[in-house]
Amino acid sequence: MAKQQSASAASQRARKKVKKNVADGIAHVHASFNNTIITITDRQGNALSWATSGGQGFKGSRKSTPFAAQVAAEVAGKAAVECGIKNLEVQIKGPGPGRESAVRALNSLGIKITEIQDVTPVPHNGCRPPKRRRI
């Protein structure tokens, strides 16, 4: 009896990933000073693929390099191409060093970039910023 329950529980966990077929989507590039996160979604905002610099094996200060952002964008872009992505609208957020290289990596995969937006949040004099670093 216990074996039947465990077999059904295992089949629920090992569900096959459903491949979506979407022609155009949005690439969200979040480039902070410490890491770069690339998420590719459809027009409704449902995630198709994502990758981070840290997830590609870069640790510490190497996560925040343009090359790490390029590798992460290539991984996310290849997974999106498998879902049928042809056109991408790119939304860049943050001041990090991986902004430009992530967009170039997506472009080099053969995906047509239709629009590039900078959606970095800018405060209208909101919270007090942290004090300056003195080195």
Curated annotation (Swiss-Prot):
One of the GO BP terms on file: translation
Protein name as catalogued: Small ribosomal subunit protein uS11
Main function: Located on the platform of the 30S subunit, it bridges several disparate RNA helices of the 16S rRNA. Forms part of the Shine-Dalgarno cleft in the 70S ribosome.
Keyword terms: Ribonucleoprotein, Ribosomal protein, RNA-binding, rRNA-binding
Organism, scientific name: Polynucleobacter asymbioticus (strain DSM 18221 / CIP 109841 / QLW-P1DMWA-1) (Polynucleobacter necessarius subsp. asymbioticus)
Subunit and partners: Part of the 30S ribosomal subunit. Interacts with proteins S7 and S18. Binds to IF-3.
GO molecular function, one term: rRNA binding
Cellular-component GO terms for this entry: ribonucleoprotein complex; ribosome
HAMAP family registered for this protein in UniProt: Ribosomal_uS11
Cystine crosslinks: none
Similarity comment text for this entry: Belongs to the universal ribosomal protein uS11 family.
